[in-house]
Amino acid sequence: MKIRIVSLIVLGFLIGCKHESIITPTVPADGSGGNALNPGLVGGYLPDIGVPDPIISLSMTLDGNLKFDSSLLCNDQDASHFQISQKDNVFCTINGRSIATFTAPFDANKNGRNTDSEVLSLISADEYRDSPVRQENLQILMKNMATIHGDKISLVFRSTLDALTFENYLRHNLDLPKDQFLEAITEKIANDNQVDKQPSTHVPNISPSFTPGTSSNLNSPFVSANAEESLSYIPTDVIPSLGRLLDSQGRVINGVSYFSNNTRGITGVDKTGAILNDGSFEFSWGDIISFSIDTFELGSTRANKTDFYISELGKDNEGKNAEALIHRYASIDDSKLIIPDKVTQIFSLYPNVINEVISLSLPNGDIELDIGDGKTQIVPGEFFKQFDSGLAALIDQSISPISRFKFEDSLPKKKSAIDSESSQIQDIINKLWGATDTVQANGWKKVDRFHIFHDSTNFYGSTGSARAQAAVNIANSAFPVLMARNDNNYWIDFGKPKAWDSNSLAFITEAPSTVVPDKVSEDTSTFNLPFISLGEIGKGKLMVLGNARYNSVLVCPNGFSWGGTVKNGTCSLSSDRDDMANFFSNVIRYLTGSTSNDVIVGTNIPEVYFKSSGQTMGSKANFELDSRFSKQTQQLTSFHDLDVNTIPLIIINAYDYKGKNINSPYDIPLSADVGSPKLSRSDVTDLIDYINNGGSVLMMETIINTNNSEISRLLDSAGIAFGIGNSVVADGNGPSGGHPDRPRSQREHGIWVIERYAAVEDESSGQQTLPYVINSDGSIEWKYIVENRPDDKPKLEVASWVESEAGDKLITHYAFIDESQHWKKDISGKIIYNVAGKPEVDNASLSLAKNKVLDAFKNSSGQRAYSECKNSEFHYEINCLEYRPGNSIPITGGLYVPRYTDIKLGESEANAMVKAANLGTNIHALYQHERYFRTKGKSGARLNSVDLNRIYQNMSVWLWNDLDYRYDDKQSDELGFKVFTQYLNCYTSNNAGGNTTCPEELKDELTQLGMIYDEKSGSYAGQMDPSYPLNYMEKPLTRLMLGRSFWDLDIKVDVRKYPGEVTTRSGGGDITLDMRNNTAAWFAGNRQPTGQWAEAHQPFSVSVSGETSPVTITIALADDLTGREKHELGLKRPPRMSKSFVIGGDSPKMQTFTVPYGGLIYAQGGNSQQVKLTFSGTIDAPLYIDGKWRNPLLSGAPIGEVVSDTFIFTAPKANLNADGYLGGIEQFAKDLDQFSADLNDFYARDEGADGDKNRKATDKSMPNNRHHFVNDVAISVGAAHSGYPVMNDSFITSSRSLNTMPLNSWLLWHEVGHNSAEAPFNVDGATEVVNNLLALYMQDRHQGKMSRVEQDIRYAFDFVNAEHGHAWGAGGAGERLVMFAQLKEWAETEFDINDWYNDKLPGFYIEESGIKGWNLFKLMHRLMRNENDDQINMKGENQCKISGIGKSDLLMLCASYAAQTDLSEFFKAWNPGSKAFLYPDDPQPYYEGGITPSGIQRVKSLKLNLPQKNPLSINSVTQH
């Protein structure tokens, strides 16, 4: 992945930047050359001896492993493959800038080279080879800035800033010590990253119950459970066929009786009675065949193929046990098994009853058993034990089994909760899609988007809809390869914000809503029926694709989508992406097993036709596969006895095309004419034999009518049903297509649209209101839901207005603008393209169109009711003029139908097609999965990741609560509650109950694996070991039980690792707290530490008196980590910790509580100066307060606190020894208070509790209000995060040192700065910048300079010039902070605060050199809050309080006013608040927002002097 970092480079280094030329190194003609990093370096000359120099083929790597692509040029050639002569030097450049020189790297006399193909490593270049530090730092730089996929590395920079950053670090910092270089890089990454996750379809592997009212139509809204059975091929007459019965190793089984409606016999014996011993038997296609030994039923199967495996004769255990029984009694050699006559004779002595005597349904080991009505259960293995006693033993002894090996030795030990086929299917899909780095590294080609052809119909000039016929897998011999999504956001790719919520309502994101649109993900995506399926017949494969047009892709893989032709054997077009070529390369590789194109492909298709406009077949071409797929395409007239080694693949069509024989405008010319089949019965039989012998067949056809023709027999034999009728892919532009009057539409190019909900009548007032309410907390309530009126669900619409035109005709206009209608054109009407090859937008024309739309909607004040939308990441906002990027697919005609549709493919999409199971089987599967990892693969069974995640998510719903689950042995156990409650009892020392107990065998396994402590563990016996750091993907059961322990106190977790045990038990008693509420800032609240600790699972009591409002008691301040991806992969503590209770007020004055893990106790509320709390059963925690230890450092709790006048600091108690901290804990507390004072100063706040607009966040007049900083072993996001409390990811229990220095901690300043940031600096894009103003102030104030920006400010001038007018939008947090640093440094010499005060300056100003530049910022803060200030000598109207202008303009106006200098050029160059927009398939960013002309005009109207010193030119920081 690419990690974007920020710095500076020269203009010539950029990719595609305007007005810039590419600079290339000058290479002397004699082969020597200069080195840009070492200009004097020459060399590489070898004497000419009259023999041509050998030509050497080269590739360039970073380190011998990571291979560069064409982004790096070496000797002006692609670095992935370039050639030089032996005596040449090698010069490598990126965008014309020299990066490496190799002086005569292949001097044979020097290097001993003896091959013609070589690999160079960049770190071995002349510039780096002699310096290990430079080599290490170069690799750090490359790996942080480049894009890496597998073993490929690419240095294509997406922005000016990336390129300049790379250059800066490359040229100036490679000699830094590695640690410093790494810190500088990662600091930049962290800073800039701050600037800028389904329920799947679920097919249980148990027999479903039938529900009345269902339909067998797979496209109906209520489909029956066994609907797939109705798709099986049913012959219209008898089709005699020959098959074989095999064991799992492919050996034929002889001597087994078989019968069906049409046949009866013994395997391996022909109809004449001849013993063939080939396992053969005759059948009629489609019959149900049963197999037996005399009357003992081995099972049955449907006869739709020619090879039948005995394990397929029954479900799971029944099939496996049938094979085990055959193995037990048969005589076996390498190729065959024979049931002796003796076995049949003995069985015949027990007719029918033998089926009761020997049960094939008994499980072996801990397996899942079908107990009927969709229920399963884990039961002990009993199959072989039945032969130890009773009649089964007598029969067994009479036969004297030839093979007595145990079932578990040859067959799987258990049935997994998820079929083992699922993981195999996932692997195959990954290969066919090229979906993972792993398969790509093995040569499978990535398919990013899959092309869906549209029907060749013509309505209003538009082509037809997307066409992909369903190809449904109806047996486990087949599986879907591709299914299109059918959820209500189907056209939006995974990872992007949804257009609709789960109720198909728009997300209301307008202020003051706090709604954040959900992302499209696996969790909420659903799928239609497959249109590509892959099945197996014997050794071979059959793949079906639901559209005949795909044949044309094989002829012209880059020229098939629209209007393709072939002339003189050459495709006329080559503009289509490689995705479909890659897909078919993967398909042919998988079907043939060949990694090269050196194969012969057979076919019965003479010609292909290319998609074009109109109701036509399209341009015709001979069906000759492109050379990248095969070396020869051979036309076949017969499929009999084909050699699968000579022709490993056949591509077929089953029917002729309708062609011109169409009778309706709805007919599709290239659909199958089912009345004109191309395959006979013998053809199909031959094809089945061909596939069974190892050949593969690929069929791409548009069969619209369900039929039972011969092709259906071929497909059925592979487990596929085809020709169901309707297309299973929706048009890719979304449900509204590109219609301008329909919401959520999309087109080829960007559109501007206003979408809105019409007002509804309020039932109580009769007034017109919006159909939703934005609550005070920012949440949304929909009135029709609240009022339970489902029929009144509002409908989203495109805003429209009506105008009268000539003749008073009323015309409806829609708030819809197609950006393509506003492209620049030359005088001949041709579109003008920019240097990037994109059409240039006529901004003037577009602005007129947007203004026309916006001016059409006015509010009651005559102002525009709408403005342009603000969220550049979300393209489905409502109530504003939204820009929605196009999808680059041309639309056609008056119905705005796209030429084609494409479907996003990738690893996430591949993982979306899996299955799950019930409670009992799920929990057992998770245990077996965990067992697998705990024994390092020696036992247990691993689940593939998709199944693991699905099961895990499902189980979390059932487990993360305190419900009492019960098993009723008198009822069918559909949900598996027996096993489920057994596991709960294992984790609760049998306190879960539920009519079950923990099985001793399971308990022993859990203790042996270290999941639960055994009896030898003393007081810890029965507790669970949380196994920190806990990766749910390896230990899912432990993770789920850890989650449940938060609610279910019967599950006890070992707390020794976290949060820690108590060491002494003294504690409790009375404390009195000042709980008055004088809070001035939310982030410095009045939650009070009590100095008490609640011990895990030990009840404690709290009583209250003196309160005037309820008191909230909180135990443990800790983030909820549940579901956070990175934490879940390495969880260091219980994900949920905090518990809260209320006492006093309307609640009881005294209550008793118990908590699962323990924690410090806090109190909040009360609203009284004297609130008395009485604790019983609690433990003293170390507490330093009022300058002394109220509870000693050696108190029993593992975590303690330092409470200064303005701060609470929470950390492991050993940290509070404060070793190495000058002045110790006392000074630490003072430094915390100094930071609080500096914070108040920076924001120009000097008022106490009785103040108004300038109240301090903390003050002696508000003694119970404090900032809070909590150290924890894990927090929700980042290394730290803001809030109340601020959380820090640092928890070293063994350290005796404090981890924070209040006057030298960027982390502390940064996070508290988030809390306290104020206008006018909080412009768009300043979230991770405005907070750092406080940090920068603290650094300057206490460390003597602004070292954080010291490096970046050096090249600020060049950067701003390179990105003039949008430097803010192009920059990261580091660059944006430099803008403010330049302003501060400018103010250091150009601004005098005394000009604003007649009398003594307030104390928050500092006139010390090096610091006084901050006075400008403090004044701006003050002016923003106070329209008038008696102390300030106002200079006309306070421009910082001007309303009605944007935040960017206000910042510029306020700064200019405060500085009494026209700073508009400075702000215009940086353009704070500007945003970068990236559009599909366009690497060039576009910038919007920021400073406006009207804002500049406001500044100009002040008639201020221009700055004598240009702040943009400042390139250093003051050191003092």
From Swiss-Prot:
PROSITE patterns: PEPTIDASE_M60, PROKAR_LIPOPROTEIN
Domain of life, per lineage: Bacteria
Membrane topology per record: Lipid-anchor
Residue ranges constituting the Peptidase M60 domain according to the UniProt record: 1085-1388
Residues with lipid group (N-palmitoyl cysteine): 17
Pfam families on file: DUF4092, M60-like_N, Peptidase_M60
Coarse class of the protein's main subcellular location: membrane
S-diacylglycerol cysteine lipid modification positions: 17
Record's keyword terms, sorted: Cell membrane, Lipoprotein, Membrane, Palmitate, Signal, Virulence
Role this protein plays: Disruption in Ogawa 395 results in decreased cell motility.
Protein name, per record: Accessory colonization factor AcfD
Organism of origin: Vibrio cholerae serotype O1 (strain ATCC 39541 / Classical Ogawa 395 / O395)
Lineage, opening ranks: Bacteria, Pseudomonadati, Pseudomonadota, Gammaproteobacteria, Vibrionales
